[in-house]
């Protein structure tokens, strides 16, 4: 209530317009919140430059890194954002767990969102004193199984090397883009110069749900719909897309199968 949202415009390639971003600041700006990598278009946003611009206006920044952390080397110290968040399952860990990184000075200001054991220092009928960081945010018995599994997943990808993962996935993206562009009626959404290994597309007049369902019958896993980004779909003038997301365990042979599957579905309509 009382909060006004200002949306950063994007160009036809799916890139944020930095000039217009700079014009959005005013003395009432309290927070900049932006995704590091679009889970729909794959656009890698220039978050470091955006953080620097926000700090010129003394505005804190929250970065959603759910689509970035599994695919890019992320250094929160270098980015200098006040907050950086990501989910566990997208980085090959378990579901139901995520990470909030925050600068200590900001986390100290935030009240606990949940009560329970370990998150208090002293308690009486008159008042409660909260525990120090990070314990004031960890009420009750923690999900130590989930956190242990997530830590192991992070160790695994770091062992592979995030630079190696990013380079290989970029090779897959370029190969897949070339293969899909050769398909009649193909429309790929998101043509940013800096892009993660995500392809959102439509083929002719085939509904995205139909394409996804038929690809599933061929053993090809994709996502369909608005991908939790309805305002983006409205901006693109569509209801949804088919989305393929590539990872380090995918191969060019699988992309060949994927492209052949799309072509097979296309010929059904």
Task: Please report, for each region that a protein language model flagged, where it lies by residue.
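Pyridoxal 5′-phosphate
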Residues: 1-269
